[in-house]
Amino acid sequence: MEGPLSVFGDRSTGEAIRSQNVMAAASIANIVKSSLGPVGLDKMLVDDIGDVTITNDGATILKLLEVEHPAAKVLCELADLQDKEVGDGTTSVVIIAAELLKNADELGKQKIHPTSVISGYRLACKEAVRYINENLIVNTDELGRDCLINAAKTSMSSKIIGINGDFFANMVVDAVLAIKYTDTRGQPRYPVNSVNILKAHGRSQMESKLISGYALNCVVGSQGMPKRIVNAKIACLDFSLQKTKMKLGVQVVITDPEKLDQIRQRESDITKERIQKILATGANVILTTGGIDDMCLKYFVEAGAMAVRRVLKRDLKRIAKASGATILSTLANLEGEETFEAAMLGQAEEVVQERICDDELILIKNTKARTSASIILRGANDFMCDEMERSLHDALCVVKRVLESKSVVPGGGAVEAALSIYLENYATSMGSREQLAIAEFARSLLVIPNTLAVNAAQDSTDLVAKLRAFHNEAQVNPERKNLKWIGLDLSNGKPRDNKQAGVFEPTIVKVKSLKFATEAAITILRIDDLIKLHPESKDDKHGSYEDAVHSGALND
């Protein structure tokens, strides 16, 4: 039902708005559907100024879309949330949410109230998470490093670097293990941001390399400076080191020309005093986000220190965190006096400028507070390097999650098929209206194995039926419970034991994607009224340039 309002806008209510929301969600899911799985296809996105992005990553695709419909925006934000929280599973979370909405709409057409559907979905989600944690998880302790490599390979399988999965999986696992540190509670932590990824196009993917230490895409400020410093004391500055000049508007009236030289000399001395304060604390590596002029460089060269200018703020923050330094935006303290203390310095075993691949880089090795690692990516062109970076980010997040949660689940649609059988049986044990909603939830989960099979050019109906038969047997017959690891083998088009094949995903990816998808679907299902206000018309007395052209006012 649509009708005018006393407010300046339109109103849609009831069935109409619900169907509209479901269609919007389905159209968003259809965009990313074909990119799911190891044989998913890539999307080329061109923005309004002509920048091209070629990607397979669900979160990136949806981030670059200009979406107007409010329900569709919810799904785009959902993918972004999954990317930030877990790092992987962004495509599947959107597909599941859209399928849940589609099936809820079918129930709505059968006159089942949305509140019953919502409570059924909540119940099904809770039960599904419990079933995963009790029956489908594999502890990583019994699998060791191989498990981490397999989880990374599974994450990369659908990406551009999947063809060299073994090479990149080892690189990712080594990088994540290199940045491990223990927090105040004694828990191991793996800050993925400590892995700096640099891209250089040219050469092949296989010439990418992992470097221990933080790699800075900068060079020393002057050729006269040392290229290697052992036992480095690092000063991190967020301001320019340049000759102090009097501010604009300051007028100095002098009668003696020699006084002019004294003023210039004093300007130089102020800068020299600043630099002496920094060097007096023992600092021998100075990193700044601003510029360093020639006069300041001369003082650093004389002191035998290494100075690097135009460091990215992001890099400076990470180096400060790793080395234990304090980033200073000014030397002035609260009293207005300029001071610099030794406690503000960070420490590293070695800072060296090296030629890696085709570029000169500065490496900061064995920092005091935390260790760091860097990956230099090589690829044919910029599009390829960007997509490789996104793929590596997903893989790094997956390995981090496996190490933190210490559990994985089989991939290839195994979890979804097992849950669909379990929830169907669970639904029949319910004697209330929620039974229908739980059964629809179970059916919705099958969209993942279905889509995987369709994208791999296989017969999805046949494959999913076989998969369900295996999982039903596993749940009915305790002697054959090992069949619960059966998932899809998409290259050969048949079911297989994915635990033996090493197709693993972190448990948290599956659990979070189920929870997030259910919550997003419920958020949209609760909407039964849309009031859209019209934009205010601006009364422009003078009119626009186009109006003037049409009226002929410019022809005089």
Curated annotation (Swiss-Prot):
Subcellular location: Cytoplasm, Cytosol; Cytoplasm, Cytoskeleton, Microtubule organizing center, Centrosome
Family, per entry: Belongs to the TCP-1 chaperonin family.
Gene Ontology biological process terms in this record: positive regulation of telomere maintenance via telomerase; protein stabilization
Organism: Macaca fascicularis
Modification type Phosphotyrosine: residues: Y181
Binding-site residues, Mg(2+): D88
GO cellular component assignments: centrosome; chaperonin-containing T-complex; microtubule
Organism ancestry: Eukaryota, Metazoa, Chordata, Craniata, Vertebrata
List of residues binding ATP: G37, G89, T90, T91
Group of enzyme by EC: hydrolase
InterPro entries: Chap_CCT_alpha, Chaperone_TCP-1, Chaperonin_TCP-1_CS, Cpn60/GroEL/TCP-1, GroEL-like_apical_dom_sf, GROEL-like_equatorial_sf, TCP-1-like_intermed_sf, TCP-1_chaperonin
Reaction(s) this enzyme catalyzes, per UniProt: ATP + H2O = ADP + phosphate + H(+)
Gene Ontology molecular function terms on file: ATP binding; ATP hydrolysis activity; ATP-dependent protein folding chaperone; unfolded protein binding
Name of the protein in question: T-complex protein 1 subunit alpha
Listed Pfam families: Cpn60_TCP1
Annotated binding of ADP, by residue: G37, G89, T90, T91, S92, S158, K159, G412, E505
